[in-house]
Regions:
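Mg2+-dependent phosphoryl-transfer enzymes with acidic/Ser/Thr/Gly-rich catalytic loops
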Residues: 2, 8-16, 35, 214, ...
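Active-site T/S-Asp motif of two-component receiver
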Residues: 19
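Active-site phosphate-binding/coordination module
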Residues: 36-159
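Short, structured coil segments at secondary-structure junctions
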Residues: 69-72, 79-80, 216-217, 271-272, ...
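Conserved acidic, metal-coordinating active-site core of Asp-based
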Residues: 113-116, 120-257
Length: 318
């Protein structure tokens, strides 16, 4: 069994642990840090011999500085499964980008239906400035909710002023601002398109775009809310990538556990993997999950792992 060989298989409850970021281990996108309790639980899981993977909609350069440098991280499933990389070894890296002709049609249709968005290629993120303004508004609303939830859970949050909203979003997510993601992609003929984050002007326009793309074929769709779809290759999803990673590692999916809270985590359900919904997950995610834990503000990943690993929560520092 090719876990990290720290302990025999019989002594550990899982061989692979995967976790989403925003709403799962990040209480706010503005604060890209794992809490000390969750960090300790993931370290304990790794020490038991389990492999640990992040499973995010973000590309690798958007997941912050702490997680890529964590000694317990082995793999990064990025862009909703479009690209998987090893943080310690590269022989198992794989990707499913959208073929360029199809990618160009996708971006043209988003524009035609009035949408705005950001694209993540194999080397960079190109974010429409209109989309950055929308993201800034969403972050402010999320921070307001996070502050309220944290006030009840005792968890700290980061809600500092960030100046110009477009520049703040580009800095936070390590992106480059563009006027048109289609024009920017056409100007980079060697790049591969892994994922598109999209905001539509209405749920009706999102429905029409998704219907058109479904008719076109070849596009994977994860709907975060009524107006916010995410697009990848049809071959890419977090769940498909996690199962493929298990196959390449020789791990039986039933020996894997995954944590998530939103629409792009649903693909990890129903694949033989134990999927655990966060307490703050959407109703749809909770209904599909195998189990449920506490909220992200209550360190839900840790509270689920600790009893199964036979460890106690670390004592809070004075």
């Amino acid at each position: 069994m090719p876990a990290n060989d720290a302990a025999p298989e019989s002594s550990r409850p899982f061989d692979l642990i995967a976790f989403d970021l925003d709403g799962t281990v990040f209480a706010s996108p503005n604060n890209q840090l794992v809490s000390p309790r969750v960090y300790a639980a993931l370290q304990a899981a790794h020490d038991s011999g389990a492999l640990v993977a992040v499973a995010s909609g973000r590309p690798l350069w958007m997941i912050g500085e702490q997680i890529p440098e964590a000694p317990w991280l082995d793999y990064a499933i990025t862009c909703n499964g479009a690209r998987v990389v090893g943080t310690r070894r590269s022989d198992l890296d794989f990707s499913h980008s959208i073929p360029r002709p199809l990618a160009e049609k996708l971006l043209a249709l988003i524009t035609e239906y009035g949408g705005t968005g950001s694209i993540h290629t194999d080397v960079e993120s190109l974010m429409e400035k209109r989309h950055c303004e929308k993201i800034a508004q969403d972050l402010a609303e999320r921070d307001a909710k996070t502050d309220d939830a944290a006030a009840h859970s005792g968890s700290p949050t980061s809600n500092e002023g960030r100046g110009n909203p477009i520049d703040a979003v580009l800095s936070l997510f390590s992106g480059s601002g563009v006027d048109s993601m289609l024009d920017a992609f056409l100007a980079r003929p060697t790049q591969q398109l892994d994922k598109v984050d999209c905001t539509m002007p209405s749920s009706d326009s999102a429905d029409k775009l998704i219907a058109k793309l479904t008719e076109l074929g070849g596009i994977g769709i994860a709907r975060m809310d009524a107006k916010t779809p995410e697009f990848t290759s049809a071959a890419a999803s977090k769940g498909a990538a996690l199962v493929e990673l298990c196959r390449r590692l020789g791990i039986v999916p039933s020996r894997a556990v995954a944590f998530g809270d939103s629409g792009n985590d649903l693909s990890m359900c129903g694949r033989g993997i134990t999927f655990v919904a966060m307490g703050n997950a959407t109703a749809e995610v909770k209904a599909a999950a195998d189990d449920q834990t506490d909220t992200v503000w209550e360190d839900g990943v840790a509270t689920w792992l600790e009893p199964r690993l036979g460890i106690s929560a670390p004592e809070a520092s004075a």
